[in-house]
């Protein structure tokens, strides 16, 4: 009956609201362990985890995380406003991208990963080639033959991104710190003071970086499948290329955080453009939103703005509210994170290792 339909409609609205709020805040949440432990919480946070952690080791944890949360909120708000004002236009641009454009965009993203690599770019290139090799493991999409599976049924499914990232960043960092001769010698600032001190001057000094990162993030996010991690890497590389302080990169430079954190959060709202206008998911999370809309009987596409505008505008408002709430909630999360650093390393690293293993298997 009508009451049942309204009840189900409320449930779906809450589900979409939860997904939107999560996508708008999750990337910044991944910045916190990156700064504290050099273990990024999300793939998008990996682009600048080194700079963020080095800032923390220099006693500038407040500046690093304060800049992260404010730039993430600004990038998210800019992306949401562009999403509201220009969703159909951005979708038309995204549809002009063929396989050729996506190929060169991927090449650009991979090149940026080498450019921003710390130290020798030869080592960065070797790491890139090794990563590309890992991505070829599994069934060949065109022919259906297993590649480099060595007779293993598990490898025939390929190596998914989550285990690869956990192994590359989390497990490797745990091994590095456990094997350090003097584990206590590597100190990270444990007291967290005023997170907004100095952030205003940073934003004014790098205001063009914020605008550029937010714009790039929104445009890249509107491309189906590009994602926030590609937006972060490309924005980082472009920011480094045009920076007046290139020599400061790799030593803990806040400019890198400004570029990348504003870009990756802006790309989240941009990913909803192809999802709502054409029903093409911009990333994995927008694919979930499309699934929820289909369960509600709403077909994403050009008609969604005409037939069910209340859902579209609800998502607009949810994005704005989520990014506004990101600042106070992010500050609270940062304040609480200091308790992580008070845990003895002999307990902390086994706990992180156990969480990594559980998280990897939980995906399947």
Predicted segment positions?
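Membrane-water interface at loop-to-transmembrane-helix junctions
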Residues: 197-215, 254-258, 309-314, 343
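Alpha-helical transmembrane segments in multi-pass membrane proteins
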Residues: 5, 17, 21-33, 67-75, ...
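Membrane-embedded alpha-helical modules
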Residues: 66-179, 295-364
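Short helical (or helix-break) motifs at transmembrane helix termini and adjacent helical loops
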Residues: 30-34, 42-55, 232-237, 271
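Single conserved hydrophobic/aromatic residue that forms the stacking wall/gate
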Residues: 2-12
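Intrinsically disordered, low-complexity non-transmembrane regions of multi-pass membrane transporters
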Residues: 142, 174-210, 241-254
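Short amphipathic alpha-helical coupling elements at transmembrane boundaries
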Residues: 47-58, 92-95, 201, 205, ...
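Membrane-interface alpha-helices at helix entry/exit sites of multi-pass transporters
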Residues: 16-17, 54-71, 244-256, 287
């Amino acid at each position: 009956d009508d009451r049942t339909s309204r009840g189900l409609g409320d449930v779906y609205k809450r589900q979409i609201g939860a997904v939107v709020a999560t996508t708008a805040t999750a990337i910044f949440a991944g910045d916190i362990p990156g700064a504290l432990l050099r273990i990024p919480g999300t793939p998008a946070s990996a682009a600048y985890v080194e700079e963020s952690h080095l800032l923390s080791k220099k006693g500038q944890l407040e500046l690093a995380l304060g800049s992260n949360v404010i730039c993430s909120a600004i990038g998210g708000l800019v992306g949401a406003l562009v999403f509201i004002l220009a969703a159909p236009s951005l979708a038309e641009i995204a549809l002009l991208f063929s396989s050729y454009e996506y190929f060169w965009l991927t090449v650009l993203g991979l090149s940026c990963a080498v450019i921003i690599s710390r130290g020798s770019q030869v080592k960065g290139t070797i790491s890139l080639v090794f990563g590309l090799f890992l991505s070829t493991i599994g069934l060949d999409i065109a022919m259906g033959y297993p590649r480099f599976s060595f007779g293993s049924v598990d490898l025939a499914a390929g190596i998914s991104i989550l285990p690869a990232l956990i192994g590359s960043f989390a497990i490797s960092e745990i091994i590095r710190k456990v094997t350090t001769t003097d584990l206590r010698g590597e100190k990270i600032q444990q007291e967290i003071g005023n997170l907004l001190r100095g952030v205003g001057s940073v934003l004014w000094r790098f205001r063009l970086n914020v605008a550029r990162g937010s714009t790039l993030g929104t445009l890249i996010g509107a491309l189906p499948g590009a994602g926030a991690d590609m937006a972060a890497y490309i924005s980082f590389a472009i920011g480094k290329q045009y920076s007046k302080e290139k020599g400061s990169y790799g030593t803990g430079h806040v400019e890198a955080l400004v570029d990348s954190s504003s870009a990756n959060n802006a790309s989240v709202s941009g990913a909803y453009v192809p999802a709502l206008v054409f029903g093409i998911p911009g990333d994995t999370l927008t694919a979930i939103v499309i699934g929820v809309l289909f369960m509600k009987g709403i077909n994403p596409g050009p008609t969604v703005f005409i037939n069910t505008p209340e859902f579209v505008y609800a998502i607009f408002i949810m994005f704005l509210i989520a990014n506004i709430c990101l600042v106070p909630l992010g500050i609270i999360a940062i304040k609480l994170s200091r308790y992580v650093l008070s845990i003895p390393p002999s307990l902390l690293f086994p706990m992180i290792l156990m969480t990594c293993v559980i998280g990897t298997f939980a995906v399947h």
